[in-house]
Amino acid sequence: MPKQLYFSKFPVGSQVFYRTKLSAAFVNLKPILPGHVLVIPQRAVPRLKDLTPSELTDLFTSVRKVQQVIEKVFSASASNIGIQDGVDAGQTVPHVHVHIIPRKKADFSENDLVYSELEKNEGNLASLYLTGNERYAGDERPPTSMRQAIPKDEDRKPRTLEEMEKEAQWLKGYFSEEQEKE
């Protein structure tokens, strides 16, 4: 396996907590909820249709494994799994990536609000990686009736590399435990 891993052209190797021969999972720069992570094929391709059958199988096997561990670690009862497959679907980084967002009962009073948050998160992803830890001045959101108030996009600061590396190291421990059981 290559030593450095790239999410498109952005190095993310130190944020990786799970890796197979063909896929990898890493912590999110600007998570919507705690535990929001990304799973990617190691080969950078923009669309699902560009993956080989082996890459596609490995990607979704990895998504399932990461989802199971993330739900356990974050005490979640469900997850949102999301892909923006192409520019017209909202993809801003030209590298297939699957969002896993662990969910708990009543974390949003309107369950579908997570999708608008995902769109906002994805819409700024490339510029966040390009500008490091600069803040993003996003659009104002309409008021919502969420039980858990999600901070406005501009208030969700990108995490530091140190914060993401620490979370990745913590999560790696759970995957080591899972691998020992297999």
Swiss-Prot record:
Report the InterPro entries cross-referenced here: Bis(5'-adenosyl)-TPase_reg, FHIT, Histidine_triad_CS, Histidine_triad_HIT, HIT-like, HIT-like_sf
Q: Which residues form the HIT domain?
A: 3-110
Among the entry's GO cellular component annotations, what is one? mitochondrion
Q: List the residue ranges of the region (Disordered).
A: 135-161
- Pfam families, per the entry: HIT
Q: Where is this motif: Histidine triad motif?
A: 95-99
Keywords in UniProt for this one? GTP-binding, Hydrolase, Nucleotide-binding
Q: Which domain of life is it from?
A: Eukaryota
The encoding gene: aph1
Q: Which organism is it from?
A: Schizosaccharomyces pombe (strain 972 / ATCC 24843)
Task of the protein: Asymmetrically hydrolyzes Ap4A to yield AMP and ATP.
Q: Could you tell me which SUPFAM superfamilies the record lists for this protein? A: HIT-like (SSF54197)
Q: Which CDD domains match?
A: FHIT (cd01275)
Quote the protein name from its UniProt record: Bis(5'-nucleosyl)-tetraphosphatase [asymmetrical]
